[in-house]
A protein has these predicted regions:
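Extended, charged alpha-beta segments that form solvent-exposed binding/catalytic grooves
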Residues: 1-81, 85-209
């Protein structure tokens, strides 16, 4: 097939019925987020590479390009960092807590995972300036309700704490390279890869578990 008729690697078209179903879910989520008090913001599809690197993501997963001034840009691969940049620059004097939502495409290059999309669609919220059990409970409740309005019935919500895994890696004096591999596997939810990394480190059973 001519390249002129193909979509780029990891992307897809939506036919009318698919586009309508996608839009219906987006509208339901937008309505739900607003009911919980989250206002929508829109950030640029591309950011400066240095901005996106703050999140600690794997740079090789980013779609990068140069602007006319030879500055390196990248398509956003998640929205937490762009929203943090937005809040720091445009909403820094706003009263807390800030409740913001988004609904956009995100881009991650998956070279060795042909079954995975490189462009996918992400809707979510950011709750800034609230760090208590009620805030945590609200986010969990909203996550569950979001899955329900999207049409899912049988699901499991997994909770994690990044400081726990960071502390465990520090306690075992892991090298920066190994830490990066572990974080990458966790970010991708690649349990098989994570188990291989941990097995190769020969941890004591308690630490490995």
């Amino acid at each position: 097939m001519s390249v002129l008729l193909e979509t780029p690697y990891g992307t897809r078209d939506f036919l009318p019925r698919e586009a309508a179903a996608k839009r219906a879910i987006e509208n339901k989520l937008a309505k739900l987020f607003l009911e919980f008090g989250y206002e929508e913001v829109v950030t640029p599809t591309m950011e400066f590479l240095e901005t996106l690197k703050i999140s600690g993501g794997v740079e090789s997963d980013l779609f990068k390009m140069f602007d006319q001034n030879n500055r390196t840009l990248a398509l956003h691969h998640e929205l937490t960092t762009p929203i943090a940049r937005l809040v720091s620059s445009r909403l820094k004097d706003s009263p807390l807590p800030l409740k913001l939502s988004y609904n956009t495409s995100v881009f991650r290059f998956r070279k060795n995972q042909p079954e995975r999309q490189c462009e996918f669609y992400q809707a979510g919220v950011e709750l800034l300036g609230a760090s208590n059990a009620f805030a945590d409970a609200e986010i969990i409740a909203l996550a569950a309700q979001s899955l329900k309005v999207a049409g899912l019935k049988d699901f499991t919500i997994c909770l994690g704490q990044v400081e726990f895994s960071n502390g465990l890696m520090e306690e075992n004096n892991l090298s920066p390279a190994v830490k990066s591999e572990i974080k990458n596997a966790i970010e991708r939810h690649n349990i098989v890869e994570l188990e291989k990394i941990v097995d190769a480190l020969n941890f004591e059973k308690s630490a490995a578990d």
